[in-house]
């Protein structure tokens, strides 16, 4: 579904643009899909042709951001608009944590979603963006349930469990998805009095804690990101509870991006069918080189950004 049709469907179903229901509904429409990082229009067209449900427009994929260092900021508006013009699927773009003016610019450009991203250099170490002030839906990362609920309380319409972006090492994504799922399971077993205590421990609003305990899930869509480089990685994260996949460097840093992109899309759809997974894992060529997360010093880990 292209971005215009998606927006029209959200309005027809929910009746009003910019409300929490509409923004969460737009995120729901991406469930079960793969969102791919792209840096040029040709990559965006490859992603769309491979079955991606959306693309993330940025000037450097996370592995290049990590390798080149320096301050990483919002992408150039001309580059973002060239991606928007190249595809019919939704386009996301990243703003720095806390940089509400970058978010204002991205909304003005007409992106379909904004990712307040730890991959970029944070602009504010005490405040995230007040996402309620925007009509465009926001995506935010989280390493645990408390972090996820704080972002939702700020207006996030989608949460992605944080892996370590730009590494090709899925271990952090696994750790944080298990942490979120484990925290949710724990809440479902608590009494009302214990949930008050849990809300304080999580530094999260009691109302959201109650909702999670009652429904056994987050109140918004939960994707995963960071380190996913193979079809098997994508399928594992779906089996662990992700409702969709972000893939950054793993596709366009591989030897055959189009084939790997299509394989990861298929693995995300048929994540519980080992026969399909074996088939799509064949003949993909070399995956991205990758970095062992354990070799990265804690202060240099992107997933630790945010609070």
Swiss-Prot record:
PROSITE patterns: PDXS_SNZ_1, PDXS_SNZ_2. D-glyceraldehyde 3-phosphate binds at residue 178. GO terms for molecular function: pyridoxal 5'-phosphate synthase (glutamine hydrolysing) activity. It comes from the Bacteria. GO terms for biological process: amino acid metabolic process; pyridoxal phosphate biosynthetic process; pyridoxine biosynthetic process. D-ribose 5-phosphate binds at residues 37, 166, 227, 248-249. Its EC number is 4.3.3.6. It catalyses: aldehydo-D-ribose 5-phosphate + D-glyceraldehyde 3-phosphate + L-glutamine = pyridoxal 5'-phosphate + L-glutamate + phosphate + 3 H2O + H(+). InterPro entries: Aldolase_TIM (IPR013785), PdxS/SNZ (IPR001852), PdxS/SNZ_N (IPR033755), RibuloseP-bd_barrel (IPR011060). Keywords: Lyase, Pyridoxal phosphate, Schiff base. The active site is at residue 94. Pathway: Cofactor biosynthesis; pyridoxal 5'-phosphate biosynthesis. Catalyzes the formation of pyridoxal 5'-phosphate from ribose 5-phosphate (RBP), glyceraldehyde 3-phosphate (G3P) and ammonia. The ammonia is provided by the PdxT subunit. Can also use ribulose 5-phosphate and dihydroxyacetone phosphate as substrates, resulting from enzyme-catalyzed isomerization of RBP and G3P, respectively. Belongs to the PdxS/SNZ family. In the presence of PdxT, forms a dodecamer of heterodimers. This is Pyridoxal 5'-phosphate synthase subunit PdxS.
């Amino acid at each position: 579904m292209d971005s215009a049709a998606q927006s029209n469907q959200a309005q027809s179903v929910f009746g009003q643009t910019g409300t929490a229901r509409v923004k969460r509904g737009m995120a729901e429409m991406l469930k079960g899909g793969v969102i791919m990082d792209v840096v040029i229009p040709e990559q965006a067209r490859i992603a769309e042709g491979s079955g991606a449900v959306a693309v993330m427009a940025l000037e450097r994929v996370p592995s290049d951001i990590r390798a080149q260092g320096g301050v990483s900021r919002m992408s150039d508006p001309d580059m973002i608009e060239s991606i928007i013009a190249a595809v019919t699927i939704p386009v996301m773009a990243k703003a720095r944590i806390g940089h509400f003016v970058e978010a204002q610019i991205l909304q003005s450009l007409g992106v379909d979603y904004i990712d307040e991203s730890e991959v970029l250099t944070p602009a504010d170490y005490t405040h995230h963006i007040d996402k309620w002030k925007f009509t465009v839906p926001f995506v935010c990362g989280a390493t645990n349930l408390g972090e996820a609920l704080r972002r939702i309380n700020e207006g996030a319409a989608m949460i992605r469990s944080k892996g370590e972006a730009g590494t090709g090492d899925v271990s952090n994504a696994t750790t944080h998805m298990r942490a979120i799922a484990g925290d949710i399971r724990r809440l479902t077993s608590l009494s009302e009095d214990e949930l008050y205590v849990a809300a304080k421990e999580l530094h999260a609003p009691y109302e959201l804690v109650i909702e999670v305990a009652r429904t056994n899930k987050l109140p918004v869509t939960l994707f995963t990101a960071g380190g996913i480089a193979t079809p098997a990685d994508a399928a594992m994260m779906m089996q662990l509870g992700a409702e969709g996949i972000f893939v950054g460097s793993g596709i366009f840093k591989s030897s055959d991006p189009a084939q790997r992109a299509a394989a990861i899309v298929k693995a995300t759809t048929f994540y519980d069918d080992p026969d399909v997974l074996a088939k799509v894992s064949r003949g993909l060529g070399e995956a991205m080189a990758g970095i062992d997360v354990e070799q990265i010093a804690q202060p240099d880990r992107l997933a630790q950004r945010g609070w």
